[in-house]
Amino acid sequence: MSHQGKKSIPHITSDRLLIRGGRIINDDQSFYADVYLEDGLIKQIGENLIVPGGVKTIEANGRMVIPGGIDVNTYLQKPSQGMTSADDFFQGTKAALAGGTTMIIDHVVPEPGSSLLTSFEKWHEAADTKSCCDYSLHVDITSWYDGVREELEVLVQDKGVNSFQVYMAYKDLYQMSDSQLYEAFTFLKGLGAVILVHAENGDLIAQEQKRILEMGITGPEGHALSRPEELEAEAVFRAIAIAGRINCPVYITKVMSKSAADIIALARKKGPLVFGEPIAASLGTDGTHYWSKNWAKAAAFVTSPPLSPDPTTPDYLTSLLACGDLQVTGSGHCPYSTAQKAVGKDNFTLIPEGVNGIEERMTVVWDKAVATGKMDENQFVAVTSTNAAKIFNLYPRKGRIAVGSDADVVIWDPDKMKTITAKSHKSTVEYNIFEGMECHGSPLVVISQGKIVFEDGNISVSKGMGRFIPRKPFPEHLYQRVRIRSKVFGLHSVSRGMYDGPVYEVPATPKHAAPAPSAKSSPSKHQPPPIRNLHQSNFSLSGAQIDDNNPRRTGHRIVAPPGGRSNITSLG
């Protein structure tokens, strides 16, 4: 199949489908009903539906009917050192559908200094010709340059982009200073955008990387050692603090550690509009693998922020996800082949970062959260689909089983056992970080745009059948609260009378005083310290004085100062 320029192929005609005998699960309710799909939309929900003849019927047999998953954190063609991640939009979205995800939001990652608009069009074209499922695009702001504001305005107003990621890490590449973050947050709030933050302290990471390499540590364990969770937590705190001063919502991507999650949870209790997104990897595995004797296995887990070496972290993050302190699960899907990872075989800083998870995400969440009793089925729908749809202004078109919503539907079997393995996954990489994990919960049937794309373990898709889904700015789930808070908590000056008292006249000083020569450059000339030395003075008495005829007193030794004798070594 050939593609010239923009996608010219017709979308596959949607089937008329009737899902009968299922239990519909939304984020806020569960009930038994039939669902009729036509023209890519949910047309009817209820019992004893009247439908046209020739409709294909799917017997759900009491199983769960849930909204298709939405993965808002993928990197399907991320550049790294002249390479791109192993899964393109065809292979990546094919894997997503096999796991029950029917929409992704991928990251556009421009080269620093390059045009955001040009990069967006490049990603858009690649996704439009290859994607198997619906998609949208974040645009990462990799540098804050002249003209970036105009491009951001065009992306929001004309291109259907309402979310942008900024970086606090990757010094001398993507990293922004605090003042740039403040400037970017302020401008993006005015556009009604969702601000995503990669939160790590890039300055300290750069110092730690240098120190650890100098110690002779070059393997994947150096990646974790140079990025301790304190550096993630500090950056999360700083991002929330900056956003709080501006009263703008902030979304922390890839929450990987207990410390970072705790800061988000505490901040939400105090009021800031902050959202946290753990990924499948941080919920399903840990960073102990960085110390594996098998270099290729250890390198497979390299991602940033790194997975926590604390093996209790996944369970802890799952608990916070279940209680609402964290709200969305992504995958951070950005796998590189073992050969690509091996570019950093002698230097951990050169290992391209990224893990798999686009296919495993929903199964991992079900197994770790619902099958353990931490989370109910409605919360599962919320953290895998609905919350993302609300935050990124896709709701209720996506993220809900309702009349008028897109016909992106999954029949989910909570009891089906699945063993995750690279031998059967849809990704092109030869490893899987969840290798051998036995999980409860898996999709039986996946429907995208009203068409069955996955059934009985078989996937049926074609390149380019996915659609670009534009997103409008100012999502109500976020900005309704922003508007109210601006009115209620706006800054106001104090009404007071004018001060009419004396004003001290400060002598004018030059803005840039010439520095005094250092002792090293003028060793023969003593330089007085910058503060007044009471033992040095050019004051002298000369000439006749009024008391010259008075007899002089001899010196007296003061035995005890006023207030009595003191001893600095005694507190008594």
UniProtKB/Swiss-Prot annotation:
PTM annotation (Phosphotyrosine): residues: Y504
NCBIfam families for this protein: D-hydantoinase
Modified residues (Phosphoserine): S8, S521, S522, S537, S540, S542
InterPro entries recorded: Amidohydro-rel (IPR006680), Hydantoinase/dihydroPyrase (IPR011778), Metal-dep_hydrolase_composite (IPR011059), Metal_Hydrolase (IPR032466), Metallo-dep_Hydrolases_sf (IPR050378)
Pfam annotation, one family: Amidohydro_1
Keywords: Cell projection, Cytoplasm, Cytoskeleton, Nitration, Phosphoprotein
Biased composition (Polar residues): 534-543
Protein name, per record: Dihydropyrimidinase-related protein 1
Residues covered by region (Disordered): 509-572
Places the protein is found: Cytoplasm; Cytoplasm, Cytoskeleton, Microtubule organizing center, Centrosome; Cytoplasm, Cytoskeleton, Spindle; Cell projection, Growth cone
Biased composition (Low complexity): 509-525
Naturally occurring in which organism (per UniProt): Mus musculus (Mouse)
Record flagged with keyword DNA repair: no
Residues bearing the modification 3'-nitrotyrosine: Y316
Assembly information from the UniProt record: Homotetramer, and heterotetramer with DPYSL2, DPYSL3, DPYSL4 or DPYSL5. Interacts with PLXNA1. Interacts with FLNA (via calponin-homology (CH) domain 1 and filamin repeat 24); the interaction alters FLNA ternary structure and thus promotes FLNA dissociation from F-actin.
One of the protein's GO biological processes: semaphorin-plexin signaling pathway
Family: Belongs to the metallo-dependent hydrolases superfamily. Hydantoinase/dihydropyrimidinase family.
Positions of post-translational Phosphothreonine modification: T101, T102, T509
